[in-house]
């Protein structure tokens, strides 16, 4: 009986010690949750006509705040951009200041224009994006006293004015060539006579006028607005046609979906308000 009581006492002590040990053990703590690393933003590479520099840079700031992307722009003449794309430059989205340069990259375009059979434009992405106006601008004070395109044509014929225009592979230069042809003026003869000078893109022409190194220049309405230049006349459709800016995602795009999403945004109300504030308009 004594042995039995001793065994019970021993067991009771074992259970008591076990309970004490259990209560003394520190409470388990959960490991702090770690946040998943943020995804790297996608880079969208946009090749755009130089005349869109100010508006697209403004839109970039807005768009990047609300989307996990970084936008890298390459602004230049549409002809230069087309050549860079053709030579293999990385580009997701192309916005041209003229149909010709886009057509030269579009396999569905007239073969007389796309003479190399280039196939860069992604199916179903090409749109007529914006419309601009071709205008005649003068430096401060209008030193040549120009009154409009009719007056310009007469003074060019007489050699009494010095005009800046885009060269032949720049859309604004091609529009100017149409204006000269409208007035039956010989561009080559004018160049040889020293009455016209050239810029490699519309920004160069704008700068020549702003600095007063020429009597006038033919540029886009939007560039005149951005540079604060005086517009004395606007070209009609009969003079140079409609000035349409096409845009398209490219087949070689590394971030095609992000580029398409950005193009969709550019056609929306928020972005269009910025374009319209400087003289662009939706295509009618």
Q: What name fits each language-model region?
A:
Residues 120-125:
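Short, P/G- and charge-enriched loop/turn segments at secondary-structure junctions
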